[in-house]
Structure formats: C-alpha cells, structure tokens
Amino acid sequence: MAPGLLENNTLSGTAAPRTEFKAIVNDLRELQAHVQRVQSAIEAPEVQSWLNEQLHHPDQLPDKELEQLALDLVDSMDKLQLQLVPSVSLLTDGFFGYLNSKTLWTVVEAQVADRLAENGPQPVSTLGLRCGIQPERLAQLLDTLVSNGIFAYNPADDTYSNNRASLLLCHDHWTQWHLWADLYPNEFFDVSRAMPQAVRLGESRTAAQIAYGTDLDLFEYLAKEQKLAKFQKTLGAGAVAQARGLTVDYPWEEIGSEPILDIGGGSGAFLASLLRAHPHLRGSLMDIQSVIELITPEFREPHGRFSDIGSRVQQLVVGDFTKQIPPSAVYTMKWCLHDWVDDDVLTILKNVRRSIVPSSVSRFLVVESIKSPGRSGRLPRYGDLIMMITCNGKERSLEDWKRLGELAGWKLYQVHRVRRAWPCIIDFRPM
C-alpha cells in the first residue's frame, strides 16, 4: 500500500517523524484558513477603496510603510508557492509565458481599455464590435488577462470592465504605459529570438545585431531604420511615469545650493524634474554632441519643454563620460551604467571619482535597478535580460555595486528605494 499524506516518507529518502508531517500539514491548513479570511476582508468594498487610495492610486505615491509591507508579503508568499507548485507547472510558465505579452498587446492595439473607459462595463458581444474583435476571441483574451489581474469580470451580468491595472493602458492616460505593451512584445520579442546565438562562446554580437543582421549597435540601427523615435518615446514615457518618486524619495535638500552635474542626461527630463520639484537646486547636463544639439532648444528657447527651469541649468556640456568628466561636487547618472560591462563601468566610476570636487556634500547618485530574489525583484531581472540582448549590458546586485564602487574609490553609503519606480538611488560617497 502506498504511503499516505502523513506516513513516514520524504523525497530525500530519509525517514521523518510522523508528527513532523502532521505539524507541517496543520501549518498549511491554518495558513490556508487565515489567507481566506484576509482575502475575504480585503474584498470588502470599504477596504478595497482604502487600498486603492493608499497603495494603488494612479496619481499619488503609495504610503511607504504599507507599500513595503505589501512587497515583503508578496515576496514571502512567492517563496512559499515556489515550494508548493508542481514542477511541471513551473516549467509551463516558461513554455507559454510569451502568450501573456502577445495577449496584452492584442487588446491594447484594439484599445479595449479605452472603449471600456468610454462606455463602462460591457459584454463581449458589444465590446467586441466596438473594438473590431470577434466576441468569442475577445472573451478568450480577457479571460487570460483577468486571471493576471488586468481587467475585471462580473459573472452576475457577464460583463467586463476596467480595473486599476487596465486603466493604465488607456491611450490618454498620462503614464502612457500602453507604449510598453507595444515595443516589448513586438520589437524586443523579435530581438529575443536570437538570444541562443548571442550567448554562445566566442560570440561578441548582441542578440539585436544578430536578429537585425547588422554590426551597428541598437541605437545606430534604430536611427538608420527610422525606428528610434518609437524607442525614445516609450522609454521617455516610462521615465515620466516614474519621475515623481525620484524627486521625493531622496533627501535632495542635503545638497543645498551645490550644483548637480547629470552625466549622460539624455533628454534632460530627469534633471528638469529635479529642478522643478526643488527650487533651490541648480544643475548642468553632459552628453554626446548629437544629444546636446537636440536638447539645447528645450532649455534655451522660450517655448522649449524645459524653458521654465532653463535659467537654473548652467551648462549643457558636450563630452564622453568614458574618457573625461567635468569637475563637480555632486553627480547624478540615471539608467546609463546598465548599458556597460563591468570593466567599462569601473572606468566610468573611476573617471567620476577623479573629477569629484571634495566638499561636505560630495556624492555620486547612481539611479539604477538592483537585482534581488523574489517576486518584487522580477523587474530588474527582466531588465537584466533586456540589457543582455540589446547592448551586452547587465543589471547588478547590491553586492555588485558595492564591489565596483570600492574598486573605483567609492563607498556605497546608502540605497534609497523609490516608490513607483523600477530603479533605486544608489548613494556613493568618495572614500
């Protein structure tokens, strides 16, 4: 007779006390009952309203303590479910995960969220006609997305509606997340097809170069094919959506009147957001010549996007941060270092260390994602693979940043978690 649930049996072949099995099973049953009670309480309308206000409001930063509690809890539950989910089920997410991305893009392209926002809850018979999708197929698409927490379904009247996640996909939503549902499940999906070739021993080309059949880097290729605007628009929208947390979740008042030099500042949106949020700050921006030529009118012309803070932008500097960096006491660098391998990052960190002006506020603030285990760390892990296939770059762990910083003469003073943003602010101080 096969051993039952509480018989002496383990996968390792080592016998365990029957009472230990009982204790584990009882713990799981108690946990299940407790989770059901909490779930029932959370689903109460007044609790939902409170959570949406404190944790999920699209236009306000979440409560710090509540958000951290939620993240820690999600990570704990994720770690537990990995121990309980059948092995083949773990593999199936890898087999079929691409379908989530393609399903999301299909409904975004058809503007399903927009039609629901305009007309309220609808059955698929009506919604499908408004979106140009076969109603039966739309039901299949939405069934998957509802199970993923995107859109809501009411079985009482067989209607679908927007929820807090799907509302972010509306084309007129200020965050413009719908752009990400296009670029990554399409262009970046195509690039990922070449991942197996790109990681082989002796291969120096990126997956993007292999997929597109070019020796140009990704940015040069996109510019040549007149596709760079879509890429820049998508990443720019993401930067806007995440900007507020970056301006408030670091003690920028510590810098006082010391000017900031934003290295590799790109469009200038990050520097502009800091100056708008903190009237006492002044700054300059450094980037390559083509970028500086592009953004100069935005700061210097009367109708430029950043003309309102243009007088507090002291210089727009042409330069190459892999070679030389102008002196400053305070530097910032956002989403640049993940484009580079460790040796290049070390060179850049050393360049900044050599140039920094000693003062009581001297620091180098690196805005990058930090890899970590658990469900809450999945975005940096996605980013790590994106960097790998597009530019041979990588995201890094906290230990990676400590090690590289110390090799370049920096002490990792503190890491500031940023609400509603994927990167952290890594505060390096000169050693």
UniProtKB/Swiss-Prot annotation:
GO molecular function: O-methyltransferase activity; protein dimerization activity
Record keywords: Coiled coil, Methyltransferase, S-adenosyl-L-methionine, Transferase, Virulence
Active site, per annotation: H338 (proton acceptor)
Origin: domain of life: Eukaryota
Induction (record text): Expression is positively regulated by the brlA and abaA transcription factors.
Enzyme Commission number(s): 2.1.1.-
Pathway participation: Mycotoxin biosynthesis
Pfam annotation, one family: Methyltransf_2
Coiled-coil regions listed in the entry: 20-85
UniProt: S-adenosyl-L-methionine binding residues: D287, G319, D320, F321
A GO biological process held by the record: mycotoxin biosynthetic process
Family matches, as InterPro entries: COMT-like (IPR016461), O_MeTrfase_dom (IPR001077), Plant_O-MeTrfase_dimerisation (IPR012967), SAM-dependent_MTases_sf (IPR029063), WH-like_DNA-bd_sf (IPR036388), WH_DNA-bd_sf (IPR036390)
Similarity-based family: Belongs to the class I-like SAM-binding methyltransferase superfamily. Cation-independent O-methyltransferase family. COMT subfamily.
Function per UniProt: O-methyltransferase; part of the gene cluster that mediates the biosynthesis of gliotoxin, a member of the epipolythiodioxopiperazine (ETP) class of toxins characterized by a disulfide bridged cyclic dipeptide. The first step in gliotoxin biosynthesis is the condensation of serine and phenylalanine to form the cyclo-L-phenylalanyl-L-serine diketopiperazine (DKP) by the NRPS gliP. GliP is also able to produce the DKP cyclo-L-tryptophanyl-L-serine, suggesting that the substrate specificity of the first adenylation (A) domain in gliP is sufficiently relaxed to accommodate both L-Phe and L-Trp.
Listed PANTHER family: O-METHYLTRANSFERASE CICE, PUTATIVE (AFU_ORTHOLOGUE AFUA_4G14580)-RELATED
Name under which the protein is recorded: O-methyltransferase gliM
Native species: Aspergillus fumigatus (strain ATCC MYA-4609 / CBS 101355 / FGSC A1100 / Af293) (Neosartorya fumigata)
Gene: gliM
